[in-house]
């Protein structure tokens, strides 16, 4: 397929702008480009067809089953889009006088209040723009707390070996040293290893609950107690809140600070690079260090300061608020229960088909299969199975993560999938398992029906080409 630049022809454009009806405001010459930008020149019909073709090649939750583990690819109600498109929200400017945007301030305050209730936290800020940004903000709160108390030696953040990769990255960015905590044979935090790792240098522990293999940390009260007795704080990574929202609260488990992913748990479209939203909640004793909120205004003298310009990715907040108001308190819990039910249903179907779960028994909202045995028996890898799913119109699950499981495939079906969809997916995967044993070569070559097959991902990562180079230089 040609790139948009390759379809460009000199003089063929869509410059049908009306005459200027306001005073011209030219860019000062010292800031102006020396050469005109080399934008593609293309007619409107060709432009439309180009992007329609690209759209047909894309795959989203409205196109089919999308069980991408740890990403919560649930259906996003169109009500949120309608609310986010209201002129009173889209036509504002962050520098407007406060008295002209009272409705927007109220919407943010209502969202903060709702998120505080769901998480069991006392304060919430909407400033962080995404999940990892929320992690970074929460870690800065922990750092500021210890510095304020004169505990400058607390420089270590404990991170389980099953954690999301952003956890150690965020801790390092915040200036901490990362210490790894191994999982036990059941896929849970090893309590003895945690006790041994805690000490006078412990600033805190980052933990997801349910964890990244889809299991609830049944010793969570003991875990938070161990860290607190060592003088550290406990951070809740809200990546998996969809499994427990409305049912259990991180604040009641002993967590001191948390972030949420509005673009996952609260039904805002995601997966295309943004925008996201990663609000941070905390207990009262950390509130003096917060960057500010719609409910409580700007931060005080001990605040870590603003972590982004203005208030939030505002329209993501509006979508999340619409989702919460549409569900109401009771149905928020129903959504979480539906996510857990669907995950266990699909897990059982796949086990009956012959797949091996990394951890037997009930799971929460997601589960991990290990294809290590299948690869030894047939040579068919997790990558082969994932690629074969594309031929049947199913987006692959997360591959080779978490790292503690060999040949891992992580499924998260979410609450918005019907049983018939799960049955169909199970049937597809059962057929792939049959082919792995009868005709493994067909899987090594999969996918067979997609425009893009198996790109060289290693070369793409090491030598990325992210801009167009004109043939003439």
Name the predicted role of every residue range.
Residues 59-79, 127-138, 266-281, 285, ...:
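Conserved phosphate/anionic-ligand binding catalytic regions in large, soluble enzymes, centered on
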Residues 103-106, 133-302, 341, 354, ...:
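Conserved PLP-enzyme active-site core in the AAT-like
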Residues 1-123, 248, 300, 307, ...:
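Non-catalytic terminal extensions of PLP-dependent enzymes
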Residues 122-128, 156-159:
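A short, small-residue-rich loop immediately preceding and capping a beta-strand
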């Amino acid at each position: 397929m040609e790139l948009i630049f390759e379809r460009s022809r000199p003089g063929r454009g869509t410059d049908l702008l009306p005459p200027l009806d306001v005073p011209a405001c030219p860019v000062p010459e010292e800031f102006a480009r020396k050469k005109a930008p080399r934008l593609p020149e293309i007619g409107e019909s060709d432009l439309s067809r180009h992007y329609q073709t690209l759209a047909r090649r894309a795959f989203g939750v409205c196109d089919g089953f999308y069980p991408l583990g740890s990403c919560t690819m649930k259906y996003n109600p169109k009500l949120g889009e309608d609310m986010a498109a209201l002129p009173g929200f889209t036509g504002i400017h962050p520098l407007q006088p406060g008295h002209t945007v009272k409705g927007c301030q109220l919407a943010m305050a209502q969202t903060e209040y709702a998120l505080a209730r769901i998480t069991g936290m006392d304060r919430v800020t909407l400033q962080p723009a995404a999940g990892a940004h929320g992690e970074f903000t929460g870690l800065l709160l922990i750092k500021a707390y210890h510095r304020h108390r004169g505990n400058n030696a607390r420089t270590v953040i404990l991170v389980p070996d099953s954690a999301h990769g952003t956890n150690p990255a965020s801790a390092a960015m915040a200036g901490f040293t990362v210490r790894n905590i191994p999982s036990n044979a059941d896929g849970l935090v090893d309590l003895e290893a945690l006790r041994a790792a805690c000490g006078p240098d412990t600033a805190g522990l980052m933990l997801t609950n349910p964890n990244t293999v889809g299991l609830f940390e049944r010793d969570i009260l003991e875990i938070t107690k161990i860290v607190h007795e060592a003088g550290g704080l406990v951070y809740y990574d809200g990546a998996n809140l969809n499994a427990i929202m409305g049912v259990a609260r991180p604040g009641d488990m002993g967590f001191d600070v948390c972030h949420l992913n509005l673009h996952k748990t609260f039904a805002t479209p995601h997966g295309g690079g943004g925008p996201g939203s990663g609000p941070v909640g905390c207990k009262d004793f950390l509130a003096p260090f917060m960057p500010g909120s719609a409910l409580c205004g700007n931060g005080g003298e001990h605040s870590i300061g603003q972590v982004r310009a203005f208030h939030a990715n505002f329209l993501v907040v509006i979508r999340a608020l619409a989702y919460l108001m549409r569900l109401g308190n009771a149905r928020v819990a129903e959504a979480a229960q539906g996510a857990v039910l669907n995950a266990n249903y699909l897990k059982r179907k796949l086990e009956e088909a012959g797949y091996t779960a990394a951890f037997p028994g009930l799971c929460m909202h997601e589960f991990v299969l290990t294809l290590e045995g299948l690869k030894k028996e047939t040579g068919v890898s997790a990558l082969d199975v994932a690629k074969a799913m594309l031929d049947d119109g199913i987006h692959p699950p997360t591959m080779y993560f978490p790292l503690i499981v060999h040949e891992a495939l992580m499924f998260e079906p979410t609450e918005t999938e019907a049983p018939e969809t799960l049955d169909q997916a199970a049937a597809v995967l059962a057929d792939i398992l049959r082919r792995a044993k009868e005709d493994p070569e067909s899987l090594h070559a999969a996918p067979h029906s997609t425009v893009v097959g198996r790109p060289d991902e290693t070369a793409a990562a090491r030598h990325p080409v992210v801009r167009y180079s004109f043939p003439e230089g």
